[in-house]
From Swiss-Prot:
It is found in: Cytoplasm. PROSITE patterns: ADOMET_SYNTHASE_1 (PS00376), ADOMET_SYNTHASE_2 (PS00377). This is S-adenosylmethionine synthase. It comes from Xanthomonas campestris pv. campestris (strain ATCC 33913 / DSM 3586 / NCPPB 528 / LMG 568 / P 25). It comes from the Bacteria. The keyword Lipoprotein does not apply. The gene is metK. Homotetramer; dimer of dimers. GO terms for molecular function: ATP binding; magnesium ion binding; methionine adenosyltransferase activity. Mg(2+) binds at residue 17. Pathway: Amino-acid biosynthesis; S-adenosyl-L-methionine biosynthesis; S-adenosyl-L-methionine from L-methionine: step 1/1.
């Protein structure tokens, strides 16, 4: 019997890097709501008293970037100098310019289906049947812990009103013969008001954050809990650390369980395959697993800038495939259009739905229908997290001729 430990971590919406991600995606959403043909590459940096928003944008839309940035910061919970960062009074510096026409000529085409990739690169998608979300269990639980911290913090008349926005989680699982069997260790560090006793904080976090999230069947006498292990976390957020867009790419994806091509997601419109192709690869892998073709599946795609067709598609099922990996690859090529325009159409990506992806993971979330108003006042309907649908699983299973 093989036995090993595996660890993943997550961070809350109030973590400095996640503040930056959310601002970048809020800018993207505001532009896409007005201009579906926009090209956006938005980067943000936050530090004590200032948010710097930079990047390259080509659009006919106009947005109030300063007001938008302040709203994101305030909605997260940074609304007072006592907390260390205040969306009302912080400086907002706009350094956004235009996208290079050299990139535009490689991406835009008279025939939309021949739209080229916005850059070269390689992207991975992954899925596993060890959780209902088809995500590795360690990252799934890590996300839910910091999500619960935010939920309790924002709850009206919360008994834990002393919680502040910044938080981190980490979960270590024990695996026996490739199956998760127990939680070996949990780390939860949460930003808090001064004067909170460590004993009271530990008890409250156990009852209100850990207990509702962690599966009782995986907890045992030997499970180690590290709650604010330094004993104090009063200085947090952008005062404690500088935050940058795109610096939590493992948190955003599979917690280290699957490989990563290196490209970040937030602030990038769907013409950037760093984002759209990673979403498509997840969609493909999840449908392969949901179809029962494998227990685990990792899909890699790669692109050349200005070229529509992927330069490669490869599949590995880690020995769990019910048919050969080569046959799964052929099915993928037949059932999924992985050209940039094909991905955008397949997943219906040109909608303002990205800010909600910028915290608690881009994957393993439930698709959600929503409506929004564009720049002309017209109403539109869309589905966020469309890459989490398993609507092609049945066709894949039938094509594979599995009983």
């Amino acid at each position: 019997m093989s036995s090993y430990l595996f660890t993943s971590e997550s961070v809350s919406e109030g973590h400095p890097d996640k503040i930056a991600d959310q601002i970048s995606d809020a800018v993207l959403d505001a532009i896409l709501a007005q201009d579906k043909r926009a090209r956006v590459a938005c980067e943000t940096m936050v530090k004590t008293g200032v948010a710097i928003v930079a990047g390259e944008v080509t659009t006919s839309a106009w947005i109030d970037l300063e007001a938008l940035t302040r709203k994101v910061i305030l909605d997260i919970g940074y609304n007072s100098s006592d907390v260390g960062f205040d969306g009302e009074t912080c400086g907002v510096l706009n350094l956004i310019g235009k996208q290079s026409p050299d990139i535009n000529q490689g991406v835009d085409r008279k025939n939309p289906e021949q739209q080229g990739a916005g850059d070269q690169g390689l992207m991975f998608g992954y899925a596993t049947n060890e959780t209902d979300s088809y995500m590795p269990a360690a990252i799934h639980l890590s996300h839910r812990l910091v999500e619960q911290q935010a939920k309790i913090r924002k709850k009206k008349n919360s008994a834990l009103s002393w919680l502040r926005p910044d938080a981190k989680s980490q979960v270590t699982l024990r695996y026996e013969d490739g199956v998760a069997t127990a939680i070996d260790a949990v780390v939860l560090s949460t930003h808090h008001d001064p004067g909170v006793k460590q004993k009271d904080l530990i008890e409250a976090v156990r009852e209100e954050i850990l207990k509702p999230v962690l599966p009782a069947k995986w907890l045992h006498k030997g499970t180690k809990f590290h709650i604010n292990p330094t004993g104090k976390f009063v200085i947090g957020g952008p005062v404690g650390d500088c935050g940058l867009t795109g610096r939590k790419i493992i948190v955003d994806t599979y917690g280290g369980w699957a490989r990563h091509g290196g490209g970040a997601f937030s602030g990038k419109d769907p013409s950037k395959v760093d984002r759209s192709a990673a979403y498509a690869a997840r969609y493909v892998a999840k449908n392969v697993v949901a179809a029962g073709l494998a227990d685990r599946c990792e899909v890699q795609v790669s692109y050349a800038i200005g070229v529509a067709e992927p330069t490669s598609i490869s599949v590995t099922t880690f020995g769990t495939g019910k048919i050969a990996d080569e046959l799964i690859e052929k099915l993928i090529r037949k059932h999924f259009d992985l050209r940039p325009f094909g991905i955008i159409q397949m997943l219906d990506l040109i909608h303002p739905m990205y800010q909600q992806t910028a915290s608690y993971g881009h994957f393993g979330r439930k698709p959600k229908d929503f409506t929004y108003t564009d720049g002309t006042g017209a109403q539109h309907s869309a589905t966020s997290f469309s890459w989490e649908k398993t609507d092609r699983a049945e066709a894949l299973r039938a094509a594979a001729k599995l009983k």
